[in-house]
Design a protein with these regions (language model features):
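A short acidic, glycine-rich active-site loop
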Residues: 94-111
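Small/aliphatic-rich secondary-structure junction motif
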Residues: 6-8, 13-97, 177, 190, ...
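Glycine-rich, Arg-bearing micro-motifs that act as flexible, cationic patches
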Residues: 153-173, 195, 288-310
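Short, flexible loop segments at boundaries between secondary-structure elements
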Residues: 313-320
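Structural beta-alpha unit
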Residues: 2-37, 51, 77, 111, ...
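Hydrophobic alpha-helical segments and helix pairs
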Residues: 128-187
Length: 320
């Protein structure tokens, strides 16, 4: 866990975590307000789950396509003292030893993940970093996401209750707290292409507008982009006289091959209609605004976003 230089912060800073870097490229201009930047700095969350390798391959393919720097991030997520107090284990007597043991086991488990990451970035000739940090996974990933253009994470899914809670926290916290878009990869399926045929979910909201702006580098390189309005409201306070046509025209001015479409689906939820439409047109990526709110000190997804996260069949690009 050595370092090529210190542009990301000192190694002994617990908030920064340990990291290594190869062939560090010049920094690109970050987005300021609503302006658009290229996709040049990516983070992928990696762990010991079977789907970690799928996330890595998708992230590496996108990084290669866009000439992006790729950071692999592994979080050593161990419980704090409240976990032991709540479970009836005296923290002073046995909790510290147990935490230390868990920490050591997770650090050891990160080694094959790191080896896989290094093999893939070498194969794809990518500039890269490997990072490992300790803390709450969602908070740590969200913190480091602020220094990137896109974060690749996994869809929450694990039979272990604590693990699915942790994976949900990663997605929700990163999306709602980092100010950066998230690419969520489904827990099942193979995805040989991501971003060739993109389906944009359009409802004329600020979240959807932000998603289109954030995804512009991907949309520009797509072979086909379909902009879909579900159950559109016509008129100046809705989706316009021709639903989704205005945003499709805006995309065309950016060199995006976009077409407008709309569908009426009053018998199913909007999220389900979106996933069904994506399947019908063989889209390999969905771009959508991410909606969420606070509830009992927690960040939770809104209805459509929650449906997408629970039932996704293709990778989903979300912005908040």
């Amino acid at each position: 866990m050595g370092a090529a230089n210190g542009r990301r912060g000192p190694l002994n800073d617990p908030d920064q975590g340990a990291w290594t870097e190869t062939m560090s490229p010049p920094r690109h201009d970050q987005r300021d307000g609503g302006s658009i930047v290229a996709l040049k700095d990516m983070v992928v969350h990696l762990d010991t789950s079977p789907r970690s390798q799928v996330r890595l391959e998708i992230a590496a393919a996108l990084a290669r396509r866009h000439g992006a720097h790729l950071t692999g991030f592994f979080v050593v997520d161990v419980p704090d003292s409240t976990f032991f107090y709540g479970g009836g284990v005296p923290y002073a007597a046995g909790g510290i030893d147990l935490v230390s043991q868990m920490r050591d086991e997770l650090a050891a488990a990160s080694k094959p993940v790191e080896e896989s990451f290094r093999a893939v970035v070498q194969r794809e000739s990518l500039t890269s970093e490997w990072r490992i940090s300790e803390g709450r996974s969602g908070q740590i990933i969200a913190l480091h996401a602020r220094y990137s253009d896109l974060v690749v994470v996994g869809q929450p899914h694990d039979p272990n209750a604590r693990e699915i809670e942790r994976s949900e926290e990663i997605v929700v916290t990163t999306l709602m707290s980092s100010g950066r878009p998230v690419l969520a990869v489904p827990y099942a399926g193979n995805f040989p292409t991501v971003g060739d045929h993109v389906l944009v979910a359009w409802n004329a909201s600020k979240e959807a507008t932000r998603a289109v702006n954030d995804a512009m580098p991907i949309l520009r390189m797509a072979q086909k982009v379909t902009v879909l309005a579900i159950n559109p409201r016509r008129g100046i306070r809705g989706h316009g006289d021709v639903p989704a046509a205005d945003i499709a025209l805006h995309l065309a001015r950016h060199g995006v091959k976009a077409e407008a479409a709309h569908t009426i689906a009053t018998d199913i939820r909007d999220g389900e209609a979106l996933l069904s439409y994506a399947s019908d047109i063989s889209a390999d990526l969905i771009v959508a605004g991410g909606y969420g709110h606070s509830r009992a000190r927690e960040l939770v997804f809104g209805g459509v976003t929650q449906t997408l996260m629970r039932e996704m069949t293709v990778p989903i690009f979300l912005s908040h």
